Regions:
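Intrinsically disordered, low-complexity regions enriched in Ser/Pro/Gly/Gln/His and often acidic
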Residues: 6-10, 29, 37-40, 68, ...
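Intrinsically disordered low-complexity regions specifically enriched for long asparagine
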Residues: 6-12, 34-36, 78-80, 400, ...
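Lectin-like carbohydrate-binding module/patch detector with strong preference for beta-trefoil
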Residues: 24, 354-501
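Compositionally biased, intrinsically disordered/low-complexity regions enriched for serine, proline
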Residues: 7-9, 33, 127, 234, ...
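A generic structural signal for short, solvent-exposed coil/turn residues
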Residues: 34-36, 60, 69, 89, ...
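Secretory targeting and sorting signals
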Residues: 1-42
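Short stretches within intrinsically disordered, low-complexity N-terminal or propeptide regions
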Residues: 33-34, 39-42, 164, 387, ...
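Carbohydrate-active catalytic/glycan-binding domains of CAZyme proteins
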Residues: 42-359
Length: 501
């Protein structure tokens, strides 16, 4: 006789509970189907500078001339597809779109903008530097790009739109902004939602133009930086705003050849703007790269700003390396250190150098040009004693204790006197001789150390956090010459480079 106890009819309340559980289970399953899948987000990811970057299929990322936007917890990256292209043929193929939740692992989503049979997006056309921003008022993603002929005579901007991040985008045409030339470009969206076009105008300089409310056209001119011409213009622009300060980044005009890229600052987009100065170690050509964008990674514990550049390989543009490095930004000083490896926690908004920074503890600093050591004059222990260069003598007045403050920022304390390397009166003037002073934690006693030369070497440039100037010896190889702060530049790179031991 079969056991029938498990088949008893449940009472009415039990039947209702059973039905409710079943219904909730079905609804839960349906909800899971309706919610779009997202990529898993790792707590921390590691970047290896100069390494090949690939997507989920192992294909080299085509994120050249990077455009990037974050939607929810996902970044969407846009780039020029340079696969198979060389400097002899840079004609348009397509604009790619990828997605990532950690900026290290990317999934190819498809072509955001495809080549057409004719017109601006047709064969033998130039389409460069795609930048995307979102217009909340119109619920539209807006892409700007450089549109040109192969001889770069048209110098226009193109505009495309989409209702979704990766598109496909609908091309809406091209124009010269306010009638001006426009080649390399960038976009900036201010905290109030107003958007701006950054545009290289060979006749005048780097333009900042306000976009219309729908972002589809240029409304008015805001500022022009530089004087125009090949020597007075800046291209490949990018911009961020931090605590009311605007920072614009860009490259000198040297074609496919790399150069020491520069930045300027202002508290208003209309200016006045500071003079342009290097943000990476002079002479390194921005560690072999050209500015493409600056990525803002805002998290629960802080905000990291990532310099994104292209290391162009003219024989294989599609294989050009993506050079992404964290920026150190303090006040009006921007510094880009060189880290062979570094880690990013995108959720926290924090980064850590894996290599490329010196160890804490006692070091000597030898000038690359003179081979002399940084020295407290006469072995003095007095506040205000001058800093000079002197042949190695083994004294503790030539030894400095490095203490890391944050990022690649250190203080240097004389082992003999216990006083800190200091810029007198917090001066921001080039040529001021350094001295030692009571340690007080001021930015005039903090130095960003930038690795130069070999990834495994120990040579650094030291940049004053307060002044943005470099520690050097004004090109002198004379015993007893003053150690001062210098403006920097590739011509004086050796006299501003120090080997730690």
């Amino acid at each position: 006789m079969p056991d029938t106890t498990s088949h008893r009819t449940p009472p009415p309340r039990a039947r209702w509970r059973t039905t409710l559980v079943t219904l909730l289970t079905l609804l839960g399953g349906l909800a899971a189907l309706l919610v779009p899948a997202t990529q898993a987000q790792a707590a921390s990811v590691t970047f290896t500078t100069g390494a090949d970057r690939t997507d989920q299929n192992g294909n080299t990322l085509q994120l050249h001339g990077l455009g990037i936007i974050k939607v929810g917890s996902t970044w969407y990256g846009f780039g020029e597809d340079k696969t198979g292209r060389t400097s002899g043929d840079t004609s348009f193929q397509d604009i790619t779109c990828y997605s990532s939740t950690d900026l290290a692992n990317w999934t190819y989503r498809g072509q955001a903008l495809s080549r057409q049979a004719s017109g601006d997006l047709g064969p033998s056309r130039i389409v460069e530097r795609p930048k995307v921003i979102y217009n909340a008022s119109t619920s539209t993603y807006v892409m700007y790009m450089h549109i040109d002929s192969t001889n770069y005579s048209e110098a226009k901007v193109g505009v495309a739109t989409s209702s979704t991040p990766c598109g496909p985008y609908t091309y809406r045409g091209s124009f010269r902004p306010l009638g001006n030339l426009s080649r390399d470009l960038g976009l900036f969206q201010d905290t109030d939602g107003t958007a701006y076009l950054l545009s290289e105008d060979r006749n005048n300089g780097l333009r900042i133009d306000k976009l219309s409310a729908d972002y589809l056209s240029v409304d008015s001119a805001v500022a022009v930086l530089g004087s125009g011409g090949s020597s007075g213009s800046v291209e490949a622009p990018a911009m961020v705003k931090i605590n009311g300060m605007y920072y614009v980044f860009g490259s000198h005009l040297t074609g496919w050849s790399l150069n020491d890229n520069v930045y300027a600052t202002a508290t208003s987009l209309s200016g006045p703007w500071s003079a342009f100065r290097d943000f990476a170690a002079p002479g390194t050509k921005t560690y072999g790269s050209q500015t493409a964008n600056v990525i803002t990674v805002q998290g629960t514990s802080g905000t990291t700003y990532i310099y994104a550049g292209d290391r162009w390989d003219t024989s294989n543009l599609g294989g050009s390396k993506l050079i992404w490095l964290p920026l150190t930004i303090r006040g009006t000083t921007v510094n880009l250190g060189q880290y062979p490896t570094w880690s990013l926690d995108a959720a926290a908004g924090t980064w850590t150098a894996g290599s490329g920074i010196p160890s804490e503890g006692v070091h000597t600093l030898k000038n690359l040009s003179s081979s002399m050591l940084m020295d407290v004059s006469n072995g003095s222990t007095a506040t205000g004693a001058k800093i000079i260069q002197w042949p190695s003598a083994g004294g503790t007045n030539q030894q400095w204790t490095l203490t890391r403050v944050a990022d690649n920022i250190y203080t240097l304390k004389s082992v003999k006197s216990g006083l800190c390397l200091d810029v007198p009166s917090k001066s921001t003037t080039a040529g001021v001789q350094l001295h030692q002073w009571t340690c007080n934690g001021g930015t005039n006693q903090q130095w960003a150390l930038d690795l130069t030369g070999s990834y495994t070497g120990s040579s650094y440039m030291l940049v004053g956090v307060g002044s943005g100037l470099h520690i050097g010896v004004a090109g002198s190889t004379t015993q007893g010459a003053a150690v001062d702060q210098e403006l920097g530049g590739s011509a004086s790179a050796n006299s501003e480079t120090w080997t730690l031991s």
